[in-house]
Design a protein with these regions (language model features):
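Short glycine-rich phosphate-binding loop at a beta-alpha junction
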Residues: 103-110
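Short, low-complexity, polybasic intrinsically disordered segments
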Residues: 112-142
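C-terminal edge-of-domain segments
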Residues: 41, 48-50, 136-137, 141-154
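A short acidic (Asp/Glu
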Residues: 45-49, 114-121, 148-149
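Acidic, metal-ligating active-site segments
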Residues: 36-37, 41-65
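Basic, amphipathic N-terminal segments that precede the first structured/catalytic domain
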Residues: 1-35
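Acidic helix/loop or adjacent segment enriched in Glu/Asp that either coordinates divalent metal
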Residues: 71-99
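N-terminal targeting/trafficking signals and adjacent low-complexity tails
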Residues: 1-6, 10, 115-117, 130-132, ...
């Protein structure tokens, strides 16, 4: 069974065709930066993931498209955080398949401070993202896409 993922515009929450939507926005806003990120939350029997593509126009704001998927609850924090990285990387592959090349950044919801559990995944996640030729950003490096994804998945 194939999972159908609906992409939506954050501004009006309407379902969109992501490739044509991004193409039109980028054409009207040349020079914009593209960031990708994912966040998740557990509620009841499900884990909900929100993956976002942020189009940022320097000093002019931006635009966000996103999708939300729910899976059976992932109890392991490590597995859930790693799934966030996987979904961000998948979105980067989609972006390339739509003809937009690589994003400027993939923002990952991991902390460089060893006192946080997510720290143990940071080097692996950074390696995965960098192996694709994409720059990663994490908690101390202003990961905008994660902030947006956090508000969507809740």
């Amino acid at each position: 069974m194939e999972i159908v993922i609906e992409w939506r515009s954050l501004s009006d929450r309407k379902v969109i065709d992501p490739a044509s939507h991004l193409s039109e926005w980028i054409e009207n806003n040349p020079g914009c930066k593209i960031y990708i990120g994912c966040d998740s939350s557990n509620l009841g029997p499900s884990t909900t993931f929100a993956t976002v593509i942020v189009l940022h126009k320097e000093n002019k704001g931006g635009h966000v498209i996103y999708n939300r998927i729910s899976e059976s609850r992932i109890k392991s924090r490590y597995e859930r955080l790693w799934r966030e990285v996987e979904l961000s990387v998948s979105a980067a592959h989609l972006l390339a398949s739509w003809g937009f090349g690589k994003p400027d950044y993939i923002d990952i919801d991991l902390n460089p401070d060893p006192k946080y559990q997510s720290n143990t995944l940071l080097s692996s996640a950074v390696g995965m993202v960098e192996s694709m030729g994409i720059k990663p950003r994490w908690k101390s490096k202003s990961p905008w896409a994660i902030s947006v994804a956090d508000s969507i998945c809740r």
